[in-house]
Amino acid sequence: MPTNIYVTEEELKKQEKIMKEIAEENKGKNLYYHIETYGCQMNVHDSEKLAGMLEKMGYKYTENLEQADVLLFNTCAVREHAEIRVLGRVSQMKELKARNPNLIIGVSGCMMQEKNVVEAIKEKYSYIDIVFGTHNIYKFPQLLWEALNSQDIVIDIIEDTKNVIEELPVKRDSNLKAWVNIIYGCNNFCTYCIVPYTRGREKSRKPEDIIAEVKELAQKGYKEITLLGQNVNSYGKDLDEDITFAKLLYKLNDIEGIERIRFMTSHPKDISDELIYAIRDLDKVCEHLHLPVQAGSNKILKKMNRKYTKEHYLEIIDKVRSNIPDIAITTDIIVGFPGETEEDFLETLDLVERVRFDAAYTFIYSKRAGTVAANMPDQVDDAVKHERLERLIELQNKISLEKSAELRGKIVEVLIEGISKRDSNKLTSRTRTNKVVHFVGDESLIGKLANVKITETKAWTMQGELVEVIR
């Protein structure tokens, strides 16, 4: 596996040329593609880039797998369950390939950065045409061209790139909201996490490239951007210029046309006063902070290599809420980490009760080969993990319900995102604190900011009445 390569301008021009050649060859043909995406928002945005390249090469999107000429699976390696699900799904494609031998099937993403997975694909899934990872998406046109012109499986995995690849075509899922990468990779090496091995070391995009992308989005009518990174708080540390994540937020806040700025994910050890003040003071930065705590026991946090304590985390929460009283705080929590006792788990429940998160994404610890935690003694019994997860979910659901109920009768600002999937007479909107509100309204309001009065609340969604359109 080649390590840490530098991608030259010549290489990118070569890929551009191949895209044009494939597009020319596809002229007049009705060719279709389908992409299935697993995992985080980074993967979702990677799939948007793959879709952008496919559209530039003359393919159109289809929901119908039977109609597809190119079928891609963009995979996630964070939890074992996700890997099993992906491989199960890929195995179902054998019959589809038998019915349509010209179908190109590709598997990409974080799972492909694991050597054992690539070997398994070669041995058990001979009908797969293309295998590539997270670092060479830019090379997809060439890989597709090779697959179209060969009977052999095309495998291209690199360990990392020294530079950030800019200006890949993007076919965005929304005309209103956009994902914007600001930093790739992770340097934290939490003992349970495979991400540093699949996504590489931290690489920040240059601020001028981010600003140019956001300005272009504003010109196209996008209202909301979400800044993406495994740890956005590390942004700029690897750059030669004087730029931090908070300073980047100030620059983006000045861009005309953008109404809302969100970001994810933040590591608690890197939360700065500067960032807290930026969220407080910048009118476009939404009052929502996703701050994964993972556990409430100092013993477990140390074993996880999280580099903060329960007390430090609670201090951060106090500082955030004293500066931004109405902020919504969400988190990630893992139960059943190796060595977690009942006392350790009770520390987690105590933290949840004290912080009162608006929502928590809760997971059972999943052993990942190649991580430090996979070889730790005292692995927790599965039945115990599931029992603890149920108790945690029960507590958090109660808190989420109570937090939502606090908004009943209040008027909140929402961005109207589209027609409700469950009731075509209603619109779906989102508050600045990232809560979903449904209300009766005309579809001409989509893309507008409005004030809505909350009439009913559940743990995750709310019902409201339109008060006024802001703009």
From Swiss-Prot:
Its cofactor is [4Fe-4S] cluster. [4Fe-4S] cluster 1 binds at C40, C76, C110. It is found in: Cytoplasm. Residues 31-149 form the MTTase N-terminal domain. PANTHER family: CDK5 REGULATORY SUBUNIT-ASSOCIATED PROTEIN 1, MITOCHONDRIAL TRNA METHYLTHIOTRANSFERASE CDK5RAP1. Catalyzes the methylthiolation of N6-(dimethylallyl)adenosine (i(6)A), leading to the formation of 2-methylthio-N6-(dimethylallyl)adenosine (ms(2)i(6)A) at position 37 in tRNAs that read codons beginning with uridine. Monomer. This is tRNA-2-methylthio-N(6)-dimethylallyladenosine synthase.
